[in-house]
Amino acid sequence: YSGYYGDSLATMKMTAYELDRPMEEDKVYYSNFNPEKEGYIRRGGLAKSKVYTLYDVNVDDDTRSNSSYMENIHIKLDAPYRDKAGKQYSNYGSYVMQKYYEKPENFKDAYAFIHNVVPGFYFKNQGGLGSMGYITISQLNVYFKYKGWVTENDTTYVNDKMVLTEKQVLRTLARVASFAGTEEVLQTTNISNDKDG
């Protein structure tokens, strides 16, 4: 997020719900649009809650002062996941990666991705008062490991002379695939006021 209003240390709670279908671009969504009432939330789908403060006290000052650091609310989707067809995956990232290997063409653009792999998420405030973040981007990061060949340098000495040789070695590598929100990604806000007050 790019900033906030209120108390950055106020405890808040949100839940991320998996959508059953994407929100279409050619439709107008007003602030009273409720994805739950309109049937957009997948029954039995992923629902992950997170308690947070806008100022993350777990981030050290060196990291926070780095010009590339962006304040964020991080929700891990690392629990076992079952897709609409009933297939079980070790976590949501495994689901996304296996969908890529099954049908790479579903990753060619945002439209194919949201209509065939990840229809989206609905983030609902579940509790807390006193702060509001100015959300500027939503992003899905898939962390994964794979085996790959890397070039390593090996230094030896022959007759007091250094000899540098390169060799290919099979290693386990860690990477991240990021799926950031773009202009095709709809970010809508549902506002409901306390009608009793």
Indicate residue ranges for each PLM-predicted region.
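Secreted, disulfide-rich extracellular signaling modules
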Residues: Y1-G197
